[in-house]
A protein has these predicted regions:
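Residues immediately within or flanking Cys/His clusters that coordinate Zn2+
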Residues: 137, 145, 162
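N-terminal presequence-like segments and adjacent domain-start helices
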Residues: 1-22
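Short metal-binding segments enriched for Cys and/or His
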Residues: 167-178
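Short, non-transmembrane amphipathic alpha-helical segments
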Residues: 61-86
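Short linker/helix segments within small regulatory modules
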Residues: 152-162
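Short cysteine-rich clusters marking metal-coordination/redox-active sites
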Residues: 140-143, 165-168
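Short edge beta-strands and adjacent turn/loop segments
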Residues: 30-59
């Protein structure tokens, strides 16, 4: 379920999607908000008094994600500068949960190149408190080894865990599979 610009007849929507591809995630600047899969949609709508509003739906990776405010500001600033509409709205949406399956293949490669292990493509098929301890083995983004151990399921942000590679002896973070 990778997020991509949808097929649309409105060329302005494609322009907005292209602009969003240039907005970096505040915590990992090598990956864009589109590659991370946090953009749910883009829409133009007429305003009652004339003019139009462009609305971007933003999905947080986790409830309380500290980067959401920065993402929202970056998107608003960029779209206002483009002057495609009289108003810009960025709505944080909980209509559907963000999952790690929304990260694009390019985004996964950029995570790896930045020293982060991308989340597994498929996660455990159960729920419960044991979930974090039964995460799939993480592949080291530095040497590719799977001889890794989970050091702490609580990384610097809610969406990351800390691992250690026994082969190259490097600590690294993995995006959690959700």
């Amino acid at each position: 379920m990778v997020t991509e610009a949808p097929a649309t007849n409105d060329p302005r929507e494609l322009v907005v999607w292209s602009a969003l591809e240039e907005i970096p995630d505040p915590e990992i600047p090598n990956i864009s908000v589109v590659e991370l899969g946090v953009i749910r949609g883009v829409a133009f709508e007429p305003l009652p008094g004339g003019g139009e509003r462009v609305t971007v739906e933003l999905l947080p990776t986790f409830v309380g994600c500290p980067a959401i405010g920065v993402m929202r500001e970056q998107i608003e600033e960029r779209l206002r500068a483009m002057k495609l509409a009289t108003e810009v709205a960025v709505n944080v949406s909980f209509a559907e949960p963000w999952t790690s399956e929304r990260i694009s293949p390019e985004g996964r490669e950029k995570l790896r190149a930045s020293g982060f292990a991308p989340p597994a493509l498929t996660g455990p098929s159960f729920d419960g408190p044991e979930l974090q301890m039964l995460l799939p083995v993480a592949e080291c983004p530095y040497c590719g080894s799977r001889d890794t151990t989970l050091e702490n399921p609580f990384g610097p942000t809610l969406c990351r865990a800390i691992y250690h590679c026994a082969s190259c002896r490097q600590p690294f973070e993995q995006f959690k599979t959700v």
